[in-house]
Regions:
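Conserved "HGTGT" condensation-loop signature of ketosynthase/thiolase-family condensing enzymes
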Residues: 1-94
Length: 94
């Protein structure tokens, strides 16, 4: 059985950009989002490189108090989902 899927919006939270246009331009330009890890001391790990988000600020999408309680990867997921809703011009009402 096949099911149809409709993609109505996209949101991105990536080391190459947190806005779709910026992300896409960096992809097209062949830029790498990989660099030396700076968010923590990685000297005890076999590799000290990774794809970190620089200057990530979830404040536009998540209350600061709530963000402090959430793991960073959860913040990334929430922000990406909210950006996808915006991109799709979808509004969620209670």
């Amino acid at each position: 059985m096949s099911k149809r899927v409709v993609i109505t919006g996209a949101g991105v939270v990536h080391s190459l950009g947190t806005e779709l246009d910026e992300f896409w331009e960096n992809i097209k330009a062949g830029k790498s989002g990989i660099s030396k890890i700076e968010n923590f001391d990685a000297s005890d790990f076999p590799s000290q490189i990774g794809a970190e988000l620089k200057d990530f600020d979830p404040g536009e999408y998540i209350d600061r108090k709530e963000a402090k309680r959430l793991a960073l990867y959860s913040q990334y997921a929430i922000v990406a989902a909210m950006k996808a809703l915006e991109n799709a011009d979808l509004e969620i009402n209670d």
